[in-house]
Design a protein with these regions (language model features):
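Bacterial Sec-dependent N-terminal signal peptides
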Residues: 1-29
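Alpha-helical transmembrane segments and their juxtamembrane interfaces
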Residues: 18-20, 138, 486
Length: 525
C-alpha cells in the first residue's frame, strides 16, 4: 500500500555555491577533470588512508598513505598536509620514507607532553608517530612476521622526523595482519594505550614510554561485520550529547563486506573501555555503519581536537576500484572533516556526524525557494542552472501528499545525472550514480547506495555537499550519512528538486505561490 504524505518545507531550501580561498587553488594548480575543489587531494600520484591526524600548536596535521611515483598503490610513504581551519590545506614534503625494515603503513600520532619517550630536544613537546612497518620480502615468503610496529619523533612541530634507533617497538611472529596502531593517553592509569588491527579482531596494548608494549586484551572475533580483514581502528571516549555521561566508541574499518557494494566500509561499536579491553554495549551481531555510501573508508579521529571535539576524516574511495578510477596525475581525495557526536536515541546510542561550521565561509550565491510549489502539472523545480559546487540543505515534513519519493538531481548537458533522495515506501535514503558518467571501469561502481532511515521524526533533513566528483549527504542531523564519488564526462552544473508525483512545498511563514529568489553574498577572502 502506497504511503501518502505531504512534503512541507519548514524552512527554506538553501543551495549555496562555494567561493574558494587562493591557498586551495594553489594546492591544485591544474584544473584536470574531477579534481576536488573543496576536499583535500594530493598534488600528484597515489593517496589512501588518512594517518596521524593530530591538532598541535594551532595546526591540523593530516598525514596519509602515499606513493609519490605513480597513480596506483606502491611502496607506502607518509604524505603530509597542514591546515589552520580544516578548509584550506598546504601539502608539505613527505614525512616518512620506507627504509630497510619495510614500507610505512598506517598509524597514529600523539603529543608526548610529559616526554615519556625521552625524545624531547627543545622547548616544545615532541610529536610521536607510531606506525606499521610492512616487509615485502617476508610477505612474499608467507612469513607471519611481515608486519610490526615502529616509532618516529619530531621536535619541530611535525616538519622533520627521526625514526627511533631500535625499531621495531612491537614485534610480531604469529599474525599475518598486525597493523594500523591507534594510540592515545589513558589518564586514569597514566599510560599509553594502543589499539591494533589483527586480522579478524583488534588487540590492546599498554606502555609507559611508547617504546615497550604489553598486550592487555582483545575484542571483536565474534562481533560486528567480518566481511573482510579489520583495519584502521580508532578508539575514542566521547560525551553523550546533552549529558555528563561518557561512552567509548570503537571505529573499525573492514576491507570487504560494506552495505552497498560489498566493498571496503567502516563500522563502529559503542561500549566501555577499562584500560585493558573494550566491551560492546550491543549484541554481537549488531552492525552500525559509519557511512552507507561506497566511499568513506579508514576513517579516523584527530588526536587533541580543540574544545574536546572529535573530528573525523576518511579516505573517499573504495578498494574495489580505487586503482581504476578515471583521474589523471593524482588519485583519491579525503572526505570533509566531520564533527562526531554521540546521542542517546530511541534506538540506543548512535554516532552522529555533522559538517564543520567553518565550511560556511565558502558560501557565495544563495537561492531561496518558498511557498506552494509543484502542483498538478509539474514535478520538478530547477534550483541551480550554472554551478558545479553546491551545498544543499533540505527540510521536509512528511504528511499527506501522493509523492512516494523526492530527490535532488544534479545533471549536465549531455544527460548524465546523479540522484540523491528519499523513498518513503522503503524508508531509505539513497544515492544513485548509475547514470553519473564514467561507470564502466569497474562493474561494482554502477551502484545505488541505500541507507535505512532510523529516525522516527516527522521531519526529513538532508544536508548535501556536492564537489565536482563527490557527494556527501548528512541525513537527520547526521544520524545517517552517505558518501559517494562519481565521474561525469562534463561537470554537473544543473540542480533540480524532483518529486515522483504531485509534490507540494509550503513554507512555515507564508501561503504564497512558489517563488524562487536569488541572493548573492560577497564574502571576505
Amino acid at each position: 500500500m502506497q504511503k501518502m504524505f505531504v512534503l512541507k518545507i519548514q524552512l527554506l531550501l538553501v543551495v549555496v555555491s562555494f567561493l574558494f580561498h587562493s591557498t586551495l587553488v594553489a594546492q591544485n594548480p591544474d584544473s584536470l577533470p574531477h579534481r576536488p575543489q573543496f576536499h583535500f587531494s594530493p598534488k600528484e600520484n597515489w593517496m589512501n588512508d588518512p594517518n596521524g591526524l593530530v591538532y598541535y600548536k594551532g595546526e591540523y596535521h593530516l598525514f596519509f598513505q602515499h606513493y609519490p611515483k605513480a597513480t596506483v598503490w606502491g611502496p607506502m610513504h607518509w604524505g603530509h598536509a597542514v591546515s589552520k581551519d580544516l578548509v584550506h590545506w598546504e601539502q608539505l614534503p613527505i614525512a616518512l620514507y620506507p627504509d630497510s625494515l619495510g614500507l610505512i603503513f598506517s598509524g597514529s600520532i600523539v603529543i608526548d607532553s610529559l616526554n615519556t619517550s625521552g625524545t624531547k630536544s627543545g622547548e616544545v613537546a615532541p610529536l610521536i608517530a607510531i606506525f606499521t612497518y610492512h616487509d615485502l620480502e617476508k610477505e612474499k615468503n608467507d612469513s607471519l612476521n611481515c608486519q610490526f610496529q615502529g616509532m618516529a619523533f619530531s621536535n619541530d612541530k611535525g616538519r622533520t622526523w627521526k625514526k627511533y634507533a631500535t625499531n621495531p617497538i612491537l614485534k610480531n611472529g604469529i599474525h599475518k595482519d598486525f597493523r594500523d596502531p591507534n594510540v592515545f593517553w589513558y589518564s586514569p592509569e597514566n599510560k599509553w594505550v594502543m589499539t591494533l588491527a589483527v586480522g579478524d579482531h583488534v588487540e590492546f596494548y599498554d606502555s609507559k614510554d611508547l617504546k615497550s608494549w604489553n598486550k592487555t586484551g582483545e575484542f571483536g572475533k565474534n562481533e560486528g561485520s567480518h566481511g573482510g580483514v579489520w583495519e584502521c581502528p580508532s578508539l575514542i571516549k566521547i560525551k553523550v550529547d546533552g549529558t555528563k555521561k561518557e561512552k567509548w566508541v570503537l571505529i573499525q574499518s573492514i576491507g570487504r563486506g560494506g552495505p552497498t557494494d560489498g566493498g571496503s566500509a567502516t563500522q563502529y561499536f559503542v561500549g566501555e573501555f577499562d584500560g585493558t579491553t573494550f566491551k560492546n554495549a550491543n549484541s554481537n551481531e549488531k552492525i552500525f555503519w559509519l557511512d552507507y555510501g561506497s566511499d568513506n573508508y579508514a576513517s579516523v579521529v584527530f588526536c587533541n581536537g580543540p574544545d574536546n571535539k572529535h573530528i573525523l576524516i576518511g579516505w573517499m574511495s573504495n578498494w574495489l576500484y580505487a586503482t581504476k578510477v578515471p583521474t589523471e596525475k593524482w588519485r583519491s581525495a579525503m572526505t570533509l572533516p566531520r564533527e562526531l557526536k554521540l546521542k542517546d536515541t530511541e534506538n540506543g546510542f548512535r554516532l552522529f556526524q555533522e559538517p564543520l561550521k567553518t565550511f560556511k565561509e565558502l558560501r557565495k550565491n544563495q537561492v531561496f525557494i518558498k511557498s506552494d510549489a509543484l502542483r498538478n502539472k509539474k514535478d520538478t523545480i530547477e534550483v541551480i542552472h550554472n554551478s558545479k559546487l553546491n551545498e544543499i540543505y533540505l527540510e521536509v515534513n512528511l504528511q499527506k501528499t501522493k509523492a512516494e519519493s523526492f530527490s535532488v538531481v544534479a545533471s549536465n548537458r549531455v544527460g548524465e545525472q546523479l540522484e540523491i533522495g528519499y523513498n518513503a515506501e522503503s524508508h531509505n535514503y539513497y544515492i544513485d550514480r548509475t547514470k553519473s558518467g564514467k561507470v564502466d571501469f569497474e562493474k561494482s561502481f554502477s551502484s545505488v547506495a541505500l541507507a535505512p532511515r532510523t529516525s522516527n521524526n516527522s521531519e526529513i533533513k538532508m544536508h548535501i555537499f556536492l564537489d565536482v566528483a563527490s557527494v556527501e549527504v548528512f541525513c537527520d542531523d547526521g544520524e545517517t550519512t552517505l558518501t559517494d564519488i562519481f565521474f561525469p564526462t562534463e561537470d554537473f552544473t544543473k540542480i533540480d528538486l524532483v518529486g515522483n508525483k504531485n509534490l507540494f512545498l509550503k513554507t512555515k511563514a507564508t501561503g504564497e505561490k512558489v517563488e524562487t529568489r536569488n541572493k548573492f553574498y560577497e564574502l571576505k577572502n
